[in-house]
Amino acid sequence: MGGWSSKPRKGMGTNLSVPNPLGFFPDHQLDPAFGANSNNPDWDFNPVKDDWPAANQVGVGAFGPRLTPPHGGILGWSPQAQGILTTVSTIPPPASTNRQSGRQPTPISPPLRDSHPQAMQWNSTAFHQTLQDPRVRGLYLPAGGSSSGTVNPAPNIASHISSISARTGDPVTNMENITSGFLGPLLVLQAGFFLLTRILTIPQSLDSWWTSLNFLGGSPVCLGQNSQSPTSNHSPTSCPPICPGYRWMCLRRFIIFLFILLLCLIFLLVLLDYQGMLPVCPLIPGSTTTSTGPCKTCTTPAQGNSMFPSCCCTKPTDGNCTCIPIPSSWAFAKYLWEWASVRFSWLSLLVPFVQWFVGLSPTVWLSAIWMMWYWGPSLYSIVSPFIPLLPIFFCLWVYI
C-alpha cells in the first residue's frame, strides 16, 4: 500500500497514494476530467507519492511546516516543491558551447516581405487608392488642408494628440514657459532699476559740473555756511534744507531736468520723423505761404507709392507742390531751421558761416579732429552723465 502500481484499482480508497490531481482525496471521481479513471491508473506519472498518513507528519514543503501535500502541493512534485534543495553546479559551460571568440559576421537581414509584411500592403495600389477616399482623408487631414495628393501625416498626428488631450484633460504645463515667463519681467525690472539709479545721478553730475565752473582751481564749497544760518562744510550739490544754497541747488537741478526732458523730446521727434510718422513740409523762405497753405504736403510721393511721404515741397507751381526726394531726417532738420529762422531773423546771418565751414579743406577737418582728441578726456567728463540715456534711446529707436 502506498507504492506505485500499474494495475487497475477497484473501488474508492483502496490505494492511499491519492492518484488524483488535487492531491487530497484518494481515487477521487474528478479523475475523468483529467483523462483518468480507475481503469487507467497510469495517468499520474509521479513515481514519488506520499502516503496519506504522512500528510500529518511535520515536514517542510511548499506550504510550510506541518503540511506536506501528497503530490508536493500545487507547485508540483519537483524537488524544489517538496522542500528539497539541490546544489547547482556553478561551472560555466565550455567555450565551444558558449560562444566563439572574435567578431562574428552580421547575419543577413531577412527580406522585407518576411520581416514587415504590412509594408508590402502599404506599397500596394489598393492601399493608395483607399487613401484618396474622402472618408479616409478626413481622418488624417485637417479641415481646410491641402488638396494635393502628397500625404503629410506629421501635423495631423499632433492635432490628433491635441484633440485627445482636450478630451482627457489639460496637458502638463511646460516648466520652460513658466521659467521664461518669470525671468523676463525680472530681468526687465532689474535693468529698469539699474537705469533709474544711473539716470538719477545725471542731475547730480551735471550740478557738480555746473558748480565747478565757479570754483576753478579749487574744491567747490557751499558759501551758505558764512551766512546768518551757518552749517557744516558741505558741497554745493548736497545742501541741506536749512542752508541758503538749498534753493539755488533746487533751481539748478530743475533747469537740468528741463534740459534732459528737451533732449529726450528732440530725440523722440527725430525718431518719429525717421519712421515716417511726421509728414513735415518746411516753410517757403521769402514767401508768405504758411504751413496751412496749399503747399503743406506732397500729393504724390517722389519715391514710389510708399506709405509715408519721403519728399518735401520746394516751391509752389500753380498751387501744386514740386517734390524732391529728401530723407525724412533732413526734412525734419530743415523744418526746424526754417521754423527758427522765421521767428529769429538773426539766424539767417549764420548761413554764410555754416556754408563756409562745410566747404573747408580736409586739413581743417583733420585739425578739428586733433583738437577733439586733445580735449577728449575733459569732454568725456561732461558727456559721461548722458551715457545711461543711450540704452533708452536705443530701445526707443528699435521698438518704435
From Swiss-Prot:
Pfam families named among the record's database cross-references: vMSA
Transcription listed as a keyword: no
Topology Intravirion: residue spans: 2-253, 203-253, 370-375
Organism domain of life: Viruses
Span of the signal peptide: none
GO-annotated biological processes: caveolin-mediated endocytosis of virus by host cell; fusion of virus membrane with host endosome membrane; virion attachment to host cell
Name of the featured protein: Large envelope protein
Species this protein is from: Hepatitis B virus genotype A2 subtype adw2 (strain Rutter 1979) (HBV-A)
Gene that this polypeptide is encoded by: S
